[in-house]
């Protein structure tokens, strides 16, 4: 399913299934390919003897439009160059282009989700609020990727990510 699928064929293909979409295709919101580690690499990194428990290989993120979910695993090592690359994995235009393929005239649910260091944050809204959702996703992604392991754990124990108060104030 890595090829680009056009028009109504895309809706039929994506009927109720999770789909990666092809990197560089006309449908996916992502500009980078999936970089999921292989099973062997994952086991080595997450073994009992590993001292790198607080430094994952990367993070998972997804965009969903109605029943269609596009997901990626991207490598991230915490450096400035890696952060810049990760923040460019999708842009407002690529998300809008992908969404336009699946959003009709009716209100459709849209979601952005990111999982990093064991914490997962999902933002959701209707298709009419997609632009606001994209803005929040950009800030959320930047914030989550810049948190230290202790900050992530502290925010999880409080049940809210850093910056959640700002999102609440802006949405009122």
Swiss-Prot record:
Tagged with keyword RNA-binding: yes
Molecular function, one GO term: RNA binding
Biased composition (Basic and acidic residues): 9-20, 159-172
Keywords attached to this entry: Host-virus interaction, Inhibition of host innate immune response by virus, RNA-binding, Suppressor of RNA silencing, Viral immunoevasion
Similarity comment: Belongs to the tombusvirus protein p19 family.
Gene Ontology BP annotations: symbiont-mediated suppression of host innate immune response
Pfam families for the chain: Tombus_P19 (PF03220)
Name the UniProt record assigns to this protein: RNA silencing suppressor p19
Entry GO CC: virion component
Keyword RNA-binding set for record: yes
Species of origin: Havel river virus (HaRV)
Subunit structure: Homodimer.
């Amino acid at each position: 399913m890595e090829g680009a699928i056009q028009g109504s064929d895309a809706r039929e293909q994506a009927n109720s299934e999770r789909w990666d979409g092809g990197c560089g295709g006309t449908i996916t919101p992502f500009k980078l390919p999936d970089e999921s580690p292989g099973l062997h690499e994952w086991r080595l990194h997450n073994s009992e003897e590993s001292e790198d428990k607080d430094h994952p290989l990367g993070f998972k993120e997804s965009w969903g439009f109605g029943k269609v979910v596009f997901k990626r695993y991207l490598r991230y090592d915490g450096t400035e160059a890696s952060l810049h690359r990760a923040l460019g994995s999708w842009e407002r235009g690529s998300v809008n282009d992908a969404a336009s393929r699946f959003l009709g005239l009716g209100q459709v649910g849209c979601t952005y989700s990111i999982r990093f260091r064991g914490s997962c944050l999902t933002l959701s809204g209707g298709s009419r609020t997609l632009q606001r959702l994209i803005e929040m996703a950009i800030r959320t992604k930047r914030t989550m990727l810049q948190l230290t392991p202790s900050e992530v754990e502290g925010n999880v124990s409080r049940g809210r990510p850093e910056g959640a108060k700002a999102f609440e104030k802006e949405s009122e």
